[in-house]
Amino acid sequence: MASKPRCHCKPKRLPERRAVTIVAGFKCADGIVLCADTEETFGNAKTSVPKLQVCYSSQTDHAEDLMFALAGAGNGPWVDKLVALTWAQVQTATSFDEACHLAEKSIKDAHEEYGNIFQPGMMPDAKLVYAVKMDGKSKLFSSDGPLVNEQRHFAIHGCGAELGTYIYNLMCPSWTRHTLSQLAVLAAYIVYQAKTYVPGVGGSTHLVKLRNDGGSFADFGNSDKWMEQHFQYLDGFLGPAFVASFDIDTPDFLSDAHLSELVDMLKLGRQEMKDWRDKAIEFTKVLKEQMEKRNRANYPWRYRKPESEINHDAAMPSESQKSEREP
């Protein structure tokens, strides 16, 4: 009796695990804003891990300088590996278009290389939002595995993506134009709402502004408390006013006095933000001066001039010597 042929079952792909985080990027004419939370979950344990990384070719950050920022959702070690491999290629670029091309090529090559190493269905997942700035220009990209696409306006990945997309479409209709600072506030607000309402999103808010003309700015959790307090304050104040604006049975609720009070409260909150920023700038300035003073006292050799510069300064005549020689 002939035996029946064996049935060759096609191996099933392992179920995808949903990324427990939120990473986002927003683009305007002035540049790009990237943001992310910091909470990472391992089973029942939570830890704080930076998911937004910034790489740059120069400390000066002029318009022509190269900057590369990436925020990733998914497998943490795999995201870190992609950042290292991509930056190693991008920093060799001599033009903006070449930098964008090398970033996309590096992500594809990494998935091709490591895809042959992992067993079928075991390849780690990574969804990225990254930005490239150079030569006074910038572009925003998102990737899902080896698939890379340029994004004209925004890109959001993670379990807070649906909420973030809803808030962006609500506050940024197609006919509006926002500045880089306004997009930074929007990015922080989206992460704040995701941390409040989406399980698995939490920790600090990390944010970076890549400005086309230079002067980029990174905030790794320094502004969390006061911004979240201000968001909570405005939501609680503007929400009832929004509902009351449709209450035609109580026309006196939005009288001139109430509108004036609303404007005064908004101005007060804005002034508090300015005061906090000025205090933070002054504190940072004093802290840098104190650290430099301490370092000069503890590590004087770091601030010594090379002998070539000392000999050169000694050979150059001083201003008093020049004036004495002049008739």
How would you label these PLM feature ranges?
Residues 21-27, 31-35, 126-133, 139, ...:
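Short beta-strand scaffold segments in enzyme catalytic cores
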Residues 134-136, 141-149:
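Long, contiguous, structured domain-core segments that constitute the functional module of a protein
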Residues 38-39, 74, 134, 211-213:
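A broadly conserved detector of short glycine/acidic/proline-rich loop/turn motifs that flank catalytic sites
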Residues 13-15, 137-138:
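Mixed-charge, polar/low-complexity N-terminal
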Residues 117-122, 129-134, 186-200:
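Conserved short alpha-helical segments that host acidic/polar catalytic motifs at enzyme active sites
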Residues 179, 183, 191-219:
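Short histidine
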Residues 7, 14-124, 145-185, 199, ...:
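Conserved short S/T/G-enriched processing/targeting/catalytic segments and their helical context
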